[in-house]
Amino acid sequence: VPAGGAVDTSFGFVRNFDDFNRIAIDTTNLWNANVDAGGTAFAVNIQANGVVRGTVDTDDNDNTNMNGPVIYRADSGGPLICEWRVAPITSVANGETFVGLSDATTDELPIQVSTTDVQTDAASDAVGFCYTGGGTANWKACGVDSDVSRTPVVCNQTFTDATGAPTRVTTPVAARFQTLRIVVLESGNADFYINGSWQARIDTAVSPDVLLNQYLAFLSGTTARSVDADYAYVSCGRRPAT
């Protein structure tokens, strides 16, 4: 059994990988798909490899999100790993996007960052990537620990984009997928990766003893837009709380 996992079983880690390759998104057993008036809830969109897509209309602050069961904890023999492969569709000109982990199935944007990088939290504990159209460039690594915001960190380390070119600009591009990965240690410290390249570290980004769930959410600005998710992965140790 790898270090950290439960030692009384050969399945010492809890994992879930959803490749969205079914006929329909599983909103009975795995995902909550929430949507405000005018938008479209996340649903399977017929494309190569299988994706799900959610949309928002032009009404400012309309929210579309999908989130899973609140069962994952960083201090259960971590690390707690969350990875999404996502792409904005149509526009990144405005509106807010959150990709990561949160602490509830509430219909909300767990963390958002203003155009001047001021963080606002709806969740008490969450950790993830935030992007605000019309704001400063690049994804921001963000966390909130027991209602205390951590300082957003700009993700601008060199990585390889979808065209194979090295770049330090992580700003999402319409119709181009990026792989966003968060690794939360048992201490609550979190490392952030884009397309496999390390981007940021936030110390005590989130409370390690709080149960979390996968969470993808975005708000409209004044432009109708969509977000595609190609897959979602999460894993953590199976060790019980002591």
PLM feature segments, named:
Residues 145-179:
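Short, aromatic/His-centered strand-loop micro-motif at the edge of beta-sheets
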Residues 53-145:
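Secretory/extracellular carbohydrate-interaction modules
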Residues 96-99, 204-242:
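Ligand-recognition surfaces built from glycine- and aromatic
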Residues 86-88, 184, 234:
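Hydrophobic beta-strand positions in extracellular immunoglobulin-like domains
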Residues 26-53:
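Extracellular glycan-recognition surfaces and repeat-rich motifs
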Residues 193-197:
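Short strand-turn-strand beta-turns centered on an Asx-Gly dipeptide
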Residues 1-35:
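Extracellular carbohydrate-recognition regions
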Residues 20, 82-84, 175-185, 190-192:
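Short tryptophan-centered beta-strand motifs in secreted/extracellular beta-sheet-rich domains
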